[in-house]
């Protein structure tokens, strides 16, 4: 998760917010109830059942993928399916080695420890984690100077589940200690439609298929956003005295929330409009864009751009960001004629 600095809270960001935990009943409780991620789900079922049959702790698992796709939920389900305890923390919270040692020494046999944003662990904390993952022991130095001594503390055999949105920031030694890497992908429209329909039932509001599809197609392939949009559309439906959410109510509610038919919000359109009108569609450097939008560079790169790149509205090139023809069509603007030297030679990559 990015520290958003001056960026105002956005309905369409997939980063977790307290309100997302308010309706815990929307989260699936078992692997069989989890929708989407078919390959990951099938593989996890094999690993869980095999570990249970042997009476062993599950091997360490690393979830990689954009925010909001179910990494935390899957970790909780794994603990529930294994019949063991679940502890949760995040990389930035573990400030020093002693913090991690306190967590690890309080685990029971085969417990699941979930560390979100594991790529943000401090180096000195990460070094403590290596022997804990590999040998199930802590190697601590007690005291200072000539009186310092090394103490080994045995740990119960536990399962570490790490989650990261930026696997490239993980060190190789840490990445190599995860026996089960799992990459999560964006959800299909049909999967999100099912999730929205199920969520509406659990929230006690009726919904017709067209209404569920309208919410699903604006949810950016992300269940967390779908659930957030559903709760807001429910408010509009109840305010209007409607017994069920149909397409018209969903469309009216989402347009009132500045979420357009492609799932773009005000910030997305502002980003595209600045490039189109101020820089002729690009190329323009990300630092220049950050200054023009008065937003931090990391917020632009990690929060605003990924969905726009995924939808084919923006290209990241060696010369900077460029809008595609689809972006101009979506904005209803004429595409300028670019000289050949302005065209991208290849994608810059993430």
Curated annotation (Swiss-Prot):
Its EC number(s): 3.6.4.-
GO annotation, cellular component aspect: cytoplasm; Holliday junction resolvase complex
Binding residue positions for DNA: 297, 316, 321
Keywords: ATP-binding, Cytoplasm, DNA damage, DNA recombination, DNA repair, DNA-binding, Hydrolase, Nucleotide-binding
GO BP term (any one): DNA recombination
Region named Large ATPase domain (RuvB-L): 4-187
Residue numbers spanned by region Small ATPAse domain (RuvB-S): 188-258
Enzyme class per UniProt: hydrolase
GO molecular function: ATP binding; ATP hydrolysis activity; four-way junction DNA binding; four-way junction helicase activity
Stretches the record annotates as Head domain (RuvB-H): 261-350
Subcellular location(s) of the protein: Cytoplasm
Sequence positions that bind ATP: 26-27, 68, 71-73, 134-136, 177, 187, 224
Record field: catalytic activity: ATP + H2O = ADP + phosphate + H(+)
Region (Disordered): 1-23
Pfam families assigned to the protein according to its UniProt record, in alphabetical order: AAA_lid_4 (PF17864), RuvB_C (PF05491), RuvB_N (PF05496)
Subunit structure: Homohexamer. Forms an RuvA(8)-RuvB(12)-Holliday junction (HJ) complex. HJ DNA is sandwiched between 2 RuvA tetramers; dsDNA enters through RuvA and exits via RuvB. An RuvB hexamer assembles on each DNA strand where it exits the tetramer. Each RuvB hexamer is contacted by two RuvA subunits (via domain III) on 2 adjacent RuvB subunits; this complex drives branch migration. In the full resolvosome a probable DNA-RuvA(4)-RuvB(12)-RuvC(2) complex forms which resolves the HJ.
Family of the protein in this entry: Belongs to the RuvB family.
UniProt remark on domains: Has 3 domains, the large (RuvB-L) and small ATPase (RuvB-S) domains and the C-terminal head (RuvB-H) domain. The head domain binds DNA, while the ATPase domains jointly bind ATP, ADP or are empty depending on the state of the subunit in the translocation cycle. During a single DNA translocation step the structure of each domain remains the same, but their relative positions change.
NCBIfam families: PRK00080.1, ruvB
Function: The RuvA-RuvB-RuvC complex processes Holliday junction (HJ) DNA during genetic recombination and DNA repair, while the RuvA-RuvB complex plays an important role in the rescue of blocked DNA replication forks via replication fork reversal (RFR). RuvA specifically binds to HJ cruciform DNA, conferring on it an open structure. The RuvB hexamer acts as an ATP-dependent pump, pulling dsDNA into and through the RuvAB complex. RuvB forms 2 homohexamers on either side of HJ DNA bound by 1 or 2 RuvA tetramers; 4 subunits per hexamer contact DNA at a time.
Name the record gives this protein: Holliday junction branch migration complex subunit RuvB
Species for this entry: Azorhizobium caulinodans (strain ATCC 43989 / DSM 5975 / JCM 20966 / LMG 6465 / NBRC 14845 / NCIMB 13405 / ORS 571)
């Amino acid at each position: 998760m990015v520290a958003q600095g001056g960026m105002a809270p956005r309905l369409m960001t997939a980063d977790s917010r307290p309100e997302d935990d308010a309706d815990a009943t929307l989260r699936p409780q078992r692997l069989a109830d989890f929708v989407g991620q078919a390959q990951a789900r099938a593989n996890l079922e094999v690993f869980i059942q095999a570990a249970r049959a042997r009476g062993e702790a599950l091997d360490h698992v690393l979830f990689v993928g954009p925010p909001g796709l179910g990494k935390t939920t899957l970790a909780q389900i794994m603990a529930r399916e294994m019949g063991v305890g679940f502890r949760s923390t995040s990389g930035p919270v573990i400030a020093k080695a002693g913090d991690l040692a306190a967590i690890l020494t309080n685990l029971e046999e085969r417990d699941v420890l979930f560390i979100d944003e594991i790529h943000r662990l401090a180096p000195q904390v990460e070094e403590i984690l290596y022997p804990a993952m590999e040998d199930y022991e802590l190697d601590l130095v007690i005291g200072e100077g000539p009186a310092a001594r090394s103490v080994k503390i045995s740990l119960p055999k536990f399962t570490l589940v790490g989650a990261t949105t930026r696997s490239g920031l993980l060190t190789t030694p840490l990445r190599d200690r995860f026996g089960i890497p799992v990459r999560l992908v964006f959800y299909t429209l049909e999967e999100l439609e099912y999730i929205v329909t199920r969520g509406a039932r659990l929230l006690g509001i009726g919904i017709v298929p067209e209404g569920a599809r309208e919410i699903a197609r604006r949810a950016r392939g992300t269940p967390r956003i779908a659930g957030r949009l559903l709760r807001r559309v429910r408010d509009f439906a109840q305010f209007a005295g409607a017994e069920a959410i149909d397409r018209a109510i969903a469309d009216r509610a989402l347009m009132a929330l500045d979420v357009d038919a492609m799932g773009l919000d005000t910030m997305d359109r502002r980003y595209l409009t600045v490039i189109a009108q101020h820089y002729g569609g690009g190329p323009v450097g990300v630092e220049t864009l950050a200054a023009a939008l008065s937003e931090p560079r990391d917020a632009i790169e990690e929060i605003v751009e990924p969905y726009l790149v995924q939808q084919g509205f923006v290209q990241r090139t060696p010369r900077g960001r460029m809008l595609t023809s689809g972006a101009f069509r979506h904005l209803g603007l004429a595409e300028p004629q670019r000289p050949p030297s302005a065209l991208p030679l290849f994608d810059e990559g993430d």
